[in-house]
């Protein structure tokens, strides 16, 4: 029995062995240089400037939408979700958190705030922890947890002016 098993294994091993030469691999084509009249990679289209009046209009149209922690649609917004949603309606991706949004765009001085700029406040911890969208040099729209709805407020109000951190202009 052992001998039969040994013969069977030897027959299988020799049956699987290669009986001829290994064929040569297919030749690989050499890379061609790019055609002189075609660009090697397409150039992305230039970004169009942000439509600031449309940003403000969208933000104002959402007044009265409820506050919802973690919310990012008209059924409920938190502050950064509100900003991300408004900018997305204009085809511009914005990060989802206040700290990431604060890292976007160019810093703008408090006297140069313009409609569509992001305004940041320190309401919970040191540094930016709340964000809104400027609708003029002295007003902004945001989703505060205190009132429960998206609303317009004055940047000069003592609560907001004492907590103002900075402004970012999104190109």
Sequence positions of predicted segments:
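Positively charged n-region of N-terminal signal peptides that target proteins for export
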Residues: 1-4
């Amino acid at each position: 029995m052992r001998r039969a098993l040994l013969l069977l294994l030897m027959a299988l091993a020799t049956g699987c062995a290669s009986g001829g030469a290994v064929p040569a691999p297919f030749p690989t084509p050499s890379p061609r240089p790019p055609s002189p009249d075609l660009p090697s990679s397409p150039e992305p289209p230039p970004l169009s400037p942000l439509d600031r009046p449309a940003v403000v209009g969208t933000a104002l149209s959402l007044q009265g939408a409820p506050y919802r922690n973690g919310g990012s649609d008209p059924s409920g917004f938190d502050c950064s979700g509100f900003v991300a949603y408004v900018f997305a309606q204009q085809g511009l991706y914005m990060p989802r958190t206040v700290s990431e949004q604060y890292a976007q765009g160019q810093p703008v001085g408090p006297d140069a705030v313009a409609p569509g700029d992001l305004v940041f406040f320190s309401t919970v911890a040191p540094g930016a922890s709340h964000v809104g969208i400027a609708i003029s040099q002295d007003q902004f729209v945001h989703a505060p947890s205190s009132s429960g709805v998206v609303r317009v407020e004055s940047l000069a109000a003592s609560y907001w002016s004492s907590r103002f951190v900075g402004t970012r202009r999104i190109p």
